[in-house]
């Protein structure tokens, strides 16, 4: 009984103590009480409020701790000091994007980072590494966001060779949670609006100085400092989408200490010639190296602690030139640049053209074919009229294949019609995913004119927006002509509100009699057109309309010899006429047929011009060219 009474008293004292703690009488305050007290004093004296400068820390990757049973205590218990499922769920990892961590093992000891980035840029289109660093083991580490880039890096394992040292770079990738947290959609939209209003389109200038003090942030009581990795990445993503052609950028007065996240500017804003990093908190010399590669000519860096470490101006200028060798104005004072090269006027960018044609005659031929082809292909009765397209294909040697895939940036977009998507996916011939149809590969492509016509008639009805067509001729020879048609189209129920998709169709055709051609190869690619992609396509298309289609300049002799009626794509006449011309050239020159044919071909099958050229170079023609 005494034992029970003692137990009861002890239990009562513990209950009273815990109850006092909950009520605040036990001398212990919980986190909510501390937060309320801190905020109350902050309202009385704003200087006591945190500036959140502790957010500006170097990026630390999220590490997954895998603890074996033997390290969890006696008996292999999964409890003890281990984290429960509930505690892991509250760590914030679920609020992070899944990215790909890439590692070049031992490369930091053998090759330069700039060299390796250059090699990867040549292999991977639009390569944008994040948080590039080298660890204590001598490895280069960085992150990429999309799986395609990670797969390409992994596929080039030991294929990148440093010729001077003979080093073959080994690449490894792994899927990990991103070391930055995701922002809410509302926060991202506000950041985009703030960036938009700070952009000067006329001068191509983006002013992000005092970014966190923008009135729109203050009105919503938001702390959107550029010292936070997720905020900086959101800003950089928006720059990449809309303002990649800026020539001047200001990041002054943002309390920036580290440039790990901002270093992505090197692959995003490649034309920045004026950069303002003044009045930040950069204190180490190595930070500025992360911006090396930008063609900066005017640089502002005053007001950073690292500047005070230089006692001589020459040393300060030399330090800046290590990252920006073209810098000719530093902190408003002219300096002698380390590298002087030809001035490239980035305003004279290569114009986006509305396609390419080798000559006007080929343009007429291609446009007539495209118009006639889609007259049969489109319309509410397209599944019936497409059967007539068997006349457009070679009877036996023609092939047709279709691929539907999401392009980068629209991976989460969905086709507007599930039934149409299922029809496309059922015959999709994506060679990157051929393991899915390796056993029945023959069913994914059609061969022969009749089989192709049947395959086309089974596809959903469509209506192509012909005013969006862009045509590029990529191959021209005497026997083959290759061209690509790309643009927008609608499919499915054409009576509903149009929801356009993007297509690219590559034709390979050969000449036939009576001014006609026959399709040898037809490859159709379809993808969902997201709103962002539609906006970009419209901008490019408007620019192409202003610039017009590119047509190669040819001489009057070539134009006179190039035609469609009975001639090949390179201007050669039909075979009977060609044989007669070769025979006449043999009689005129005394050369054997192969050399006579070459002489005529070099002169665009202009007989008079070929005879004139032969008389000019007769003395230099080799003896074996003449009949004995």
UniProtKB/Swiss-Prot annotation:
The entry's keywords: Leucine-rich repeat, mRNA transport, Nucleus, Repeat, RNA-binding, Transport
TAP-C domain residues: 576-628
GO biological process: poly(A)+ mRNA export from nucleus
Residue intervals of the NTF2 domain: 365-526
Listed Gene3D superfamilies: 3.10.450.50, 3.30.70.330, DNA helicase RuvA subunit, C-terminal domain, Ribonuclease Inhibitor
A single GO cellular-component term on record: nuclear envelope
Residue span, RRM domain: 100-179
Localization of this protein: Nucleus
Xref: Pfam families: LRR_NXF1-5, NXF_NTF2, Tap-RNA_bind, TAP_C
Superkingdom: Eukaryota
InterPro entries for this protein: LRR_dom_sf, NTF2-like_dom_sf, NTF2_dom, Nuclear_transport_factor_2_euk, Nucleotide-bd_a/b_plait_sf, NXF_fam, RBD_domain_sf, TAP_C_dom
One GO MF term attached to the UniProt entry: RNA binding
Region Disordered, residue ranges: 47-83
PROSITE patterns: NTF2_DOMAIN, TAP_C
UniProt keyword annotation of RNA-binding present: yes
Spans of repeat LRR: 245-270, 271-294
Biased composition (Low complexity): 63-72
TM spans (from-to): none
Coiled coil: none
Stated family: Belongs to the NXF family.
Subunit structure: Interacts with nucleoporins, Nup98, Nup153 and Nup214.
Function: Involved in RNA export from the nucleus to the cytoplasm.
Domain comment in the entry: The leucine-rich repeats and the NTF2-domain are essential for the export of mRNA from the nucleus.
Name of the molecule in the record: Nuclear RNA export factor 1
Taxonomic source organism: Caenorhabditis elegans
